[in-house]
């Protein structure tokens, strides 16, 4: 159970490369600003880049704390055991890149929820498909759309382009919903 909880907390995505780039830019600009008559501009820009990098790391830390709090609450209620049972079989998938994890019955969306993660019952999902429309507007980003029998849709797992992993997630989710009696678009 502890390994499972740790894996869920690690689903919180931190763009370390981007944060490191901001820190390097901040250091470079600070070095340019030292001893220069117009150095104040460089130092100000360095401060802004450093602040953005700190925000990136701080946001991830806050999100991890929220996930841990949600897990503690679920453990106290006894509902964490249900998730653990679903994700303990070998076919469960965890994608930190797309911030989605799913087992045979439940899908966990780590991107959308500000307070930890959102739990979706896959037995309520009637259809799974790839979507690039949000509120009727076309998007460059593609999503996995989960549709219930009443037609309501939830978008999870955003991607800039279709990858093998993303396509595989859609195929797996389609198979799971098909087993649950859902219809699929071809």
What do these predicted ranges mean?
Residues 15, 27, 74, 78-81, ...:
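Short, flexible helical or helix-coil boundary motifs
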Residues 1-14, 185-186:
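Short, Lys/Arg-enriched, disordered terminal segments
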Residues 97-102, 118, 145-147:
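Short, exposed beta-strand/loop patches in secreted or surface proteins that constitute
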Residues 7, 70, 169-172:
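Charge-rich, solvent-exposed alpha-helical interaction surfaces
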Residues 2, 44-102:
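Anionic N-terminal interaction surfaces
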Residues 128-186:
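Acidic, Ser/Thr- and proline-rich intrinsically disordered linker/docking segments
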Residues 103-134:
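Phosphoinositide-binding peripheral membrane targeting modules
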Residues 8-69:
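Alpha-helical transmembrane spans
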């Amino acid at each position: 159970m502890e390994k499972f909880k740790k894996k869920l907390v690690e689903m919180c995505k931190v763009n370390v490369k981007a944060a490191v780039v901001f820190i390097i830019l901040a250091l470079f600009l600070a070095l340019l600003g030292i001893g220069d008559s117009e150095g104040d501009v460089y130092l100000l820009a360095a401060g802004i880049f450093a602040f953005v990098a700190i925000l990136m790391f701080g946001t991830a830390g806050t999100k991890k704390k929220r996930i841990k709090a949600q897990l503690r609450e679920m453990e106290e209620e006894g509902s964490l055991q249900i998730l653990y049972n679903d994700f303990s079989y070998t076919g469960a998938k965890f994608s930190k890149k797309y911030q989605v994890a799913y087992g045979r019955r439940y899908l966990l969306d780590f991107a959308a929820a500000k307070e930890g993660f959102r739990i979706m019952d896959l037995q309520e999902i009637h259809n799974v498909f790839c979507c690039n429309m949000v509120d009727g507007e076309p998007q460059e980003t593609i999503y996995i759309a989960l549709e219930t029998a009443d037609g309501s849709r939830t978008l999870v797992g955003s991607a800039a382009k279709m990858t093998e992993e993303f396509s595989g997630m859609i195929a797996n989710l389609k198979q799971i919903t098909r087993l649950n009696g859902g219809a699929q678009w071809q």
